[in-house]
Amino acid sequence: KYQNSPESDIYHKSNVLYYASKLGIFWTGLVHDLTKFTPTEFNRSVKYFHGKKSPTIVERASHDNFSYICVAHTGRNKHHWQYWVDYTRWEIVVNKIPYRHALEYVADVLSASKVYNPKDFNFMVAHDYFKEHSKTYLMHPATKEFILWCIKEAHDNGFKAVKKKISKAKYIEISNKYTPTIIVPITNIGMENFEIK
């Protein structure tokens, strides 16, 4: 009913706010994704609005798989893993998403799952979807583990099991198992390796 429509953004945002408040980050939920209303994101989203597909997918189809909407959005919103990925000439540097933004990601995943799969929605559907799709993300393993833990705990024991004091301690415990950044070497660097036609 709501998928990929203006109503879906409102429905998604209201669900993010609900889950964020349950996670103890009400203000973060309230200001979630406000950049969607900036000219860069909003105007292009209107231009590439389809009704059955995300505007980013439609824009990519028109621009050789590049989306200005996506680049602008993920570069301004700290709950997106792309925000925490940096590049040097020879390596990709993947940082952990800080605690508050990782919780916002949890709220975002739960809400998106509810919007896009309303008939079958439950927390484990969201958990499994994230687990499968995050395999292709350049996401720090500590962040991934924390997000999966939060969703499973909320599913098994309710939001009381992931209240701030508990989830913050778990975030620190998981984070301490990993280095702050993961370095991914880049091979075949340089445009000389590509044929430009």
Predicted regions and their residues:
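Metal-dependent phosphohydrolase cores
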Residues: 1-196
